[in-house]
């Protein structure tokens, strides 16, 4: 059989690449050294869809985090898999740590993260009642989410 493109690896990147190539009438084959799709690093990742506040401004990671965070709900809907926009909190336990939160906030703003803000103790405990009582503030990133990496990779492979 003849192919236009050979994709090496059936993890999340390989399967996403093959899925995208399918939009262009290209005949793509995916080869995998493991016994099945998503048996390597992809299945063991944290499942976090990052908002983009921690990446260096101007970096590809910053761009891909922000764009991916916006694109993931629609992709998951199309693939009929769950996506949860749960947000993320970066906790601050004392005032000496607050400049770190402010630096992350500035990075996120530069990267184009929507809705990013610092929340104080009262609102933090409303957002997450089980948070440590010692937390005094947090950076809140409402555009962060989670998706099962195994389900995502398998759905893209299909």
Where are these regions (language model features)?
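N-terminal Rossmann-like FAD-binding beta1-loop-alpha1 element of flavoenzymes
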Residues: 3-30
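Proline-glycine-enriched beta-turn/loop adjacent to the NAD(P) cofactor-binding site
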Residues: 11, 34, 47
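Aromatic/hydrophobic pocket-lining residues that form π-stacking "cages" and hydrophobic walls in ligand
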Residues: 17, 72, 104, 155-156
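Glycine-rich FAD pyrophosphate-binding loop
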Residues: 22-44
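Short beta-to-alpha linker loops that shape the active-site pocket of alpha/beta-hydrolase fold enzymes
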Residues: 34-36, 124, 156
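Dinucleotide-binding Rossmann-like beta1-alpha1 core, especially the glycine-rich loop
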Residues: 47-127, 136
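The feature captures the short pre-catalytic strand/loop hairpin that immediately precedes
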Residues: 132-133
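Helical element adjacent to the flavin cofactor pocket in flavoenzyme catalytic cores
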Residues: 139-158
């Amino acid at each position: 059989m003849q192919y236009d493109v050979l994709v090496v690896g059936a993890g999340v990147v390989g399967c996403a690449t093959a899925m995208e190539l399918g939009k262009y009438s290209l005949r793509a084959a995916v080869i995998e050294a493991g016994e099945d799709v998503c048996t390597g690093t992809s299945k063991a990742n944290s499942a976090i869809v990052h908002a983009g506040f921690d990446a260096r401004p101007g970096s590809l990671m910053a761009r891909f985090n922000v764009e991916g965070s916006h694109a993931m709900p629609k992709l998951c809907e199309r693939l009929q898999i769950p996506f949860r926009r749960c947000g993320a909190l970066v906790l601050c336990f004392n005032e000496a740590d607050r400049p770190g939160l402010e630096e992350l906030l500035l990075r996120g703003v530069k990267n184009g993260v929507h809705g990013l803000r610092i929340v104080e103790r009262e609102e933090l405990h409303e957002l997450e009642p089980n948070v440590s009582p010692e937390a005094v503030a947090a950076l809140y990133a409402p555009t962060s989410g989670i998706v099962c990496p195994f389900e995502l990779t398998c759905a893209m492979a299909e």
